[in-house]
From Swiss-Prot:
Functions by promoting the formation of the first peptide bond. One of its GO terms (molecular function) is RNA binding. The gene is eif5a. It comes from Thermococcus kodakarensis (strain ATCC BAA-918 / JCM 12380 / KOD1) (Pyrococcus kodakaraensis (strain KOD1)). CDD domains: S1_aIF5A. This is Translation initiation factor 5A. GO terms for cellular component: cytoplasm. Belongs to the eIF-5A family.
Length: 136
């Protein structure tokens, strides 16, 4: 899988995803400035990083193309928890891997992780983050 694709700036909306400075981000706001007599319309895109939570913004012409991440949303089971990593097993492929707690676990679920529970995790651009706990 390519992990990213190209999309025209004019097609972007809040709630969608974009790659800014190599970091996948969720778009919070898109404002388009009307062009003057000569020139093209510009879009200001404000977004929040999926992994680090930092606010980023870019300004691009609406006719330009930007990279958009392909996010693979999967289900896994927590096998073990160490002080700095979580060992996760994919429920479809039964592949196991380690996810760092810092940056790899969403802040909302950090305190709720226990061994044996089922979680939803996102994989994009070679990085993994546990997003939420699944109810069985």
């Amino acid at each position: 899988m390519g992990d990213k694709t190209k999309v025209q700036v004019s097609k972007l909306k809040p709630g969608r995803y974009i790659i800014i400075d190599g970091e996948p981000c969720r778009i919070v706001n898109v404002t388009v400035s009307s062009p003057g007599k000569h020139g093209s319309a510009k879009a200001r895109i404000e977004a929040v990083g999926i992994f680090d939570g930092k606010v980023r913004s870019i300004v691009k012409p609406t006719s330009a193309e930007v990279d958009v991440p392909i996010i693979d949303k999967r289900v896994g089971q927590i096998i073990a928890i160490t002080p700095d990593t979580v060992q996760l097993m994919d429920m479809e492929t039964y592949e196991t891997f380690d996810v760092p707690i810092e940056g790899g676990v969403d802040d909302e679920v950090k305190g709720q992780l226990t061994e044996g529970i089922t979680v939803e995790y996102w994989e994009t651009l070679g990085r993994i983050q546990i997003k939420k706990i699944r109810g069985e």
